């Protein structure tokens, strides 16, 4: 165990050394002991948090998230469910019809024995009593002694909680019947960075945490099997598939067992428990272990295991090495949700859906947890990038998408439908502030993918692949921002690309280029293109003559101040002068008579986000 943790520490130090120019980061190291009553779903715990203030600021208060308090009538989450036009169907009852829905918040109907609850009963700092108060899901602690820059303090608390009825992500008795899905269950230190405290109320969307180490002991009924973040420290005492080969598990007359987990260099700790969990374990060639915990639908859960080992290897190669000693796929929660070193996901799905969910959640281990952008502020950097590599894995490893198909057509169509709906909002919108869940989902999952596909279109696939790998190398464990990523892309490609980040993600501008005019100029042909919308793009254009021979014409975008490699190497390429965005039209001459032209096509493989492809074709 010490060798594993030492290797992880060396790995983290190496990555940190690469990115010394990044801002400082706070550190929160947790020691927690919690006792769960599995009959009434209530628990009590203690927490010792060693907080390292690496900032240049003196901190006189600190804040904690109390996420479970969102699952109470009249909470902000409850209010949002009653006001948003398209609430999450899992969180509401429909008193009307599918055509004319009348939504009722499930949270509003919770009884006192069904609500979520997280309450602090005592709080101290370095042995001195601390004053605290809470409003909904945020706890404010006024410190008796300010935390000076570059100093540590120890915060101790006792707390009690109640696991809510399963409504979203965490709770009791999941749709698959898993007893406990314990995500965001403990008082969690709010992130403090160069922007200050991120005291965001929990409304059901994304998270942003503080890096730290977790030492967690969980005591509950001895018949339960526990799975979660971290490495189990007492496997030969607990058994349940954790034990070393050949070890005989000691019997106990006690009614409870205490499970001891340690997770290093993570920003969250999640667990699930059920007395009927089956546990399958696989050891990879590098010594890392992959775990599967499930209680129902064993055929599909068995079937996905060899596939997920292949996907794990694919992600290691595609992005970079997974640094932690293990990862667990756990039946629990609703849908699928990513956490530190594990995922909770529903199991009652068809194989294609289950393996797709597992692939998506595993990909989050790199983007949501290892790179760890502020996903509340930039959900598209997590969900979009995750969906991008999920889609590639589904095509290249799982073969769920035919090899001859362009894999991102679904993302484009989803984006196009959002544009047509008139509901699109700038993708820089905070995840909690979207007017509709529809606009949020398309922006985060689909437009986030398209951000990468359009970089591929602008600078070439090889440059994009190098960008993703370098992004991992330079920003693992560093909470990168959109600007950090685009600067990597600029360095790799040699292009100027800040404008693309601004235009595509910070506005709702769209692209529409058209073939405006095709005219004879003696033995040459003058082709005039027109920009009809505000989003700039370079242009790929195919000209096919009557003999069936195709010529590729590339029109660079001036503001990139560069050219991409030939993305169609099987066709001769002509590079014409760059097109400046301020010019609505662009004309160039082709050394081919008009009467010999059969067709002209903009973006022949439909790789750009042009919203109107009908005006991209000229045929005689």
Protein language model features and the residues they cover:
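Hydrophobic helix-coil surface modules that form long, contiguous segments used
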Residues: 188-196, 203-359, 388
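Hydrophobic alpha-helical and helix-loop surface patches within well-folded domains
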Residues: 27-28, 66, 261, 291-528
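Solvent-exposed beta-hairpin/edge-strand motifs
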Residues: 61-128, 182-183, 219, 223-224, ...
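N-terminal, polar/Ser/Thr-rich
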Residues: 19-44, 56, 73, 498-499, ...
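Non-catalytic accessory/interaction domains
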Residues: 235, 363, 462, 475-620
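Short, hydrophobic/aromatic-enriched beta-strand segments in well-ordered soluble domains
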Residues: 47-49, 53, 66, 151-165, ...
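A surface-exposed beta-strand-loop module
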Residues: 52, 58, 91-92, 97-177, ...
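Glycine/proline-rich low-complexity spacer/linker segments in large multi-domain proteins
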Residues: 76-88, 160-214, 605-620
């Amino acid at each position: 165990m010490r060798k594993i943790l030492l290797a992880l520490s060396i790995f983290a130090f190496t990555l940190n050394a690469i990115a010394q120019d990044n801002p400082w980061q706070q550190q929160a190291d947790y020691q927690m002991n919690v006792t769960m009553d599995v009959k009434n779903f209530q628990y009590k715990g203690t927490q010792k948090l060693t907080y390292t203030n690496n900032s240049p600021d003196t901190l006189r208060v600190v804040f904690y998230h109390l996420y479970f308090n969102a699952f109470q009538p009249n909470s902000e989450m409850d209010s949002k469910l009653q006001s948003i036009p398209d609430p999450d169907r899992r969180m509401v009852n429909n008193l009307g019809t599918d055509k004319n829905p009348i939504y009722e918040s499930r949270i509003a109907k919770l009884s006192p024995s069904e609500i979520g609850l997280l309450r602090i009963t005592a709080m101290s700092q370095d042995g001195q009593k601390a004053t605290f108060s809470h409003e909904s899901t945020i706890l404010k602690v006024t410190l008796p002694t300010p935390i000076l820059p570059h100093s540590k303090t120890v915060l101790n608390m006792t707390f009690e909680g109640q696991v809510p009825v399963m409504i979203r992500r965490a709770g009791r008795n999941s749709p698959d019947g898993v007893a406990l899905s314990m995500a965001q269950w403990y008082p969690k230190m709010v992130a403090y960075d160069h922007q200050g405290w991120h005291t965001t109320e929990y409304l059901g969307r994304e998270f942003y945490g503080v890096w730290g180490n977790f030492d967690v002991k969980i005591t509950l009924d001895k018949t339960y099997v526990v799975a979660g973040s971290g490495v189990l420290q007492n496997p030969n005492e607990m058994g349940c598939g954790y034990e070393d080969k050949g070890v005989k598990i000691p019997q106990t007359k006690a009614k409870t067992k205490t499970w001891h987990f340690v997770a290093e260099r993570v920003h969250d700790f999640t667990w699930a428990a059920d007395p009927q969990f089956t546990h399958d374990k696989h050891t990879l060639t590098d010594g890392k272990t992959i775990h599967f915990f499930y209680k129902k639908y064993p055929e599909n859960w068995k079937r996905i295991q060899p596939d997920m080992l292949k996907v794990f290897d694919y992600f290691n190669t595609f992005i970079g090495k997974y640094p932690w000693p293990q990862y667990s796929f756990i039946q629990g929660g609703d849908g699928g949700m990513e956490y530190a070193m594990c995922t909770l996901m529903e199991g009652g799905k068809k194989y294609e859906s289950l393996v797709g969910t597992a692939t998506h959640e595993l990909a989050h281990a790199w983007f949501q947890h290892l790179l760890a952008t502020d996903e509340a502020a930039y959900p598209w950097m997590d969900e979009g990038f995750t969906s991008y590599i999920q889609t590639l894995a589904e095509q290249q490893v799982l073969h769920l998408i035919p090899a001859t198909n362009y894999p991102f057509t679904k993302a484009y169509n989803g984006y196009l439908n959002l544009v047509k709906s008139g509901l699109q909002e700038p993708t820089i919108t905070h995840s909690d502030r979207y007017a509709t869940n529809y606009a949020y989902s398309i922006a985060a999952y689909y437009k986030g993918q398209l951000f990468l596909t359009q970089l591929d279109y602008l600078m070439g696939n090889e440059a994009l692949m190098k960008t993703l790998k370098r992004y991992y190398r330079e920003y693992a464990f560093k909470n990168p921002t959109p600007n950090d990523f685009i600067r990597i892309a600029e360095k790799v490609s040699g292009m100027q690309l800040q404008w693309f980040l601004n235009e595509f993600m910070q506005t709702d501008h769209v692209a529409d280029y058209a073939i405006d005019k095709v005219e004879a100029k003696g033995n040459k042909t003058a082709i005039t293109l027109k920009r009809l919308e505000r989003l700039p793009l370079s242009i790929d254009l195919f000209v096919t003559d009557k003999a069936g021979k195709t010529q590729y014409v590339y029109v660079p975008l001036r503001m990139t101040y560069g050219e991409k490699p030939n993305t169609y190497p099987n066709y001769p390429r002509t590079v014409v002068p760059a097109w400046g965005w301020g010019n609505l039209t662009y004309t160039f001459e082709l050394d081919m008579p008009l009467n010999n032209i059969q067709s002209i096509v903009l973006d022949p493989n439909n790789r750009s986000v042009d919203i109107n492809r009908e005006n991209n074709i000229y045929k005689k």
